C-alpha cells in the first residue's frame, strides 16, 4: 500500500514540477525528457532482468546444494545458544524455537524462499503461546526485529546487480555490507532487549555479542591502517576468498550428506530464469516511476535540498545522492532495489554513490512489509514497540553504512 502511494507520487509530483517549468520558465524540453525516460527506463529494466539470469542461476544452484546439505540446520544449531537467551519467555523445548532458528539461518544465507514460510510458521507457533491474540508478545517483537535488521552473510542479489551494471569488482561491497548489517542487527538486539528488560550482561550474550564486536573492531582497525588502494585490494580479495570458501563448504556439505550435488545445483539453477522474468514488471514499474521523477528535475531538487541542509551543518555531502535507497528500504524492497539500480545507472556502479546505494540495500530489510505480513498472518494489530525497534535498527544500519562507505570508498 505504501509503495502504491509512493509510485503515484512519483508521477504526480513530476507532472506538477514539469508544468511549473513549462509555464513559468519556458522549459519546452521537460515533457519530452520525461517521456523519453519512460522508454529508456523500460528498456533498461528489461535488459537488467535478463542479464541477471546467469548469475542468479549460479547462486540459486549453490544455495540449493547448501540447503540439501544441511547448512541451514548446522547454522541454526550454531545460533541456538544466543537465541535461547534472547527469547526467555519461550518454554524450553517448544517447537517454535526450531522454526525461529531455521528462519534466521535461512535469512543469513539469503534463502528468502525458505525463510518466509519458516517465519510464518514461527509466528503461528508464537501466537499459540500468546495470551492476548491481538497484541504482539516480546518474543514476536524480538523475532521480527532480527528479521527487519537484515542480517545476511551472502548478499547475492546485490552482487548480481552490480555485475550486470558493469562493476569492475561486483564483490567489493561484500565486506562493507557485512559490517553495516552487523551494526544494524546489534542495534536492534540491544534496543529490543532494553525495551524487554532482557539481561544483556548474561555470560552467553556478552561472549557472543562481545566476540562479534571484537572481530568487527579488528576488521575496521585493520582496514584503517591501510591506504585506500591497498584497502580496496585486500577487501576485494578477502570477499572473493570467503565466497569461494562458501561454495566449497556447501559442496562438501552436500557430499557429506550423500546429496547428488550436480542434480541439486541444476534443480536450484532452474529457478534462475523464472526469478529473473518474475522481477521484470516490478523493475519496469519502479524504474519508470523514478525515471520520470528524475527527468522532471524533482529528484535533483530533493537531493540538492538535503545537500544544502547537510552542507549548512558543515558535513560532507557525497552520501546524499544515495539516500533515496536508504529512505525507500524500510517501505519497499522492490522500490529500494529500483533506487539502487537508478543510482548505479546515473552515477556508475563503481562510483561512491553507486556503492553506498548497494550497502544501504544490504544493511537493512523492508521493516514495514515484514511487520505487515508477519503480524497480519496471525491477526496481531497491536504491535507495541516493534515499529520503534525496527526503525531504530534501520537508522543504525544507515549511519553505519555511510561511515563504512567513507572508510572503504571515500
Where are these regions (language model features)?
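Hydrophobic alpha-helical context, especially transmembrane and signal-peptide helices
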Residues: 5, 33, 45, 94, ...
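Short glycine/serine/threonine-biased micro-segments
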Residues: 12, 59, 68, 108, ...
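Hydrophobic alpha-helical segments, principally membrane-spanning helices and signal/leader peptides
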Residues: 36-39, 46, 95-97, 132-140, ...
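C-terminal transmembrane helix pair
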Residues: 114-115, 122-161, 167-197, 323-410
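Membrane-embedded alpha-helical segments and adjacent helix-loop junctions characteristic
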Residues: 30-128, 257-346
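Generic hydrophobic alpha-helical membrane-segment signal
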Residues: 2, 91, 98-100, 135-140, ...
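Signature of multi-pass transmembrane helix bundles
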Residues: 1-54, 163-293, 311-313, 385-410
Amino acid at each position: 500500500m505504501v509503495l502504491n502511494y509512493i509510485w503515484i507520487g512519483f508521477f504526480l509530483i513530476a507532472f506538477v514540477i514539469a508544468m511549473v517549468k513549462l509555464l513559468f520558465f519556458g522549459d519546452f524540453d521537460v515533457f519530452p525528457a520525461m517521456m523519453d525516460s519512460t522508454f529508456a527506463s523500460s528498456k533498461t529494466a528489461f535488459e537488467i532482468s535478463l542479464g541477471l539470469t546467469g548469475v542468479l542461476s549460479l547462486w540459486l544452484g549453490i544455495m540449493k546444494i547448501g540447503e540439501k546439505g544441511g547448512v541451514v540446520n548446522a547454522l541454526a544449531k550454531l545460533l541456538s545458544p544466543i537465541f535461547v537467551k534472547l527469547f526467555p519467555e519461550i518454554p524450553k523445548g517448544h517447537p517454535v524455537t526450531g522454526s525461529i532458528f531455521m528462519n534466521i539461518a535461512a535469512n543469513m544465507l539469503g534463502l528468502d524462499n525458505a525463510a518466509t514460510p519458516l517465519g510464518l510458521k514461527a509466528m503461528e507457533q508464537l501466537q499459540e503461546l500468546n495470551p492476548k491474540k491481538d497484541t504482539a508478545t516480546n518474543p514476536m517483537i524480538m523475532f521480527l526485529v532480527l528479521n527487519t535488521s537484515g542480517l545476511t552473510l551472502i548478499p547475492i542479489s546485490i552482487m548480481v546487480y552490480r555485475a550486470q551494471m558493469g562493476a569492475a569488482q561486483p564483490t567489493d561491497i561484500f565486506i562493507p555490507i557485512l559490517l553495516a548489517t552487523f551494526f544494524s542487527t546489534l542495534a536492534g538486539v540491544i534496543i529490543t532487549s532494553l525495551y524487554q528488560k532482557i539481561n544483556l550482561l548474561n555470560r552467553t550474550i556478552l561472549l557472543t555479542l562481545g566476540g562479534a564486536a571484537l572481530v568487527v573492531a579488528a576488521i575496521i582497525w585493520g582496514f584503517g591502517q591501510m591506504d585506500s588502494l591497498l584497502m580496496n585490494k585486500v577487501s576485494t580479495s578477502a570477499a572473493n576468498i570467503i565466497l569461494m570458501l562458501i561454495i566449497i563448504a556447501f559442496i562438501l556439505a552436500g557430499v557429506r550428506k550423500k546429496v547428488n550435488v550436480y542434480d541439486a545445483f541444476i534443480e536450484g539453477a532452474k529457478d534462475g530464469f523464472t526469478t529473473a522474468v518474475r522481477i521484470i514488471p516490478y523493475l519496469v514499474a519502479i524504474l519508470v516511476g523514478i525515471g520520470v521523477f528524475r527527468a522532471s528535475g524533482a529528484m535533483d531538487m530533493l537531493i540538492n535540498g538535503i545537500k544544502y541542509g547537510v552542507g549548512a551543518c558543515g558535513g560532507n555531502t557525497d552520501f546524499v545522492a544515495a539516500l533515496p535507497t536508504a529512505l525507500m528500504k524500510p517501505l519497499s524492497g522492490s522500490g529500494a532495489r529500483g533506487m539502487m539500480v537508478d543510482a548505479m545507472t546515473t552515477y556508475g556502479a563503481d562510483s561512491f554513490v553507486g556503492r553506498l546505494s548497494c550497502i544501504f540495500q544490504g544493511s537493512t530489510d523492508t521493516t514495514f512489509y515484514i511487520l505487515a505480513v508477519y503480524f497480519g498472518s496471525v491477526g496481531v494489530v497491536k504491535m507495541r514497540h516493534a515499529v520503534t525497534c525496527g526503525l531504530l535498527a534501520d537508522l543504525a544500519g544507515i549511519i553505519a553504512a555511510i561511515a563504512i562507505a567513507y572508510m572503504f570508498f571515500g
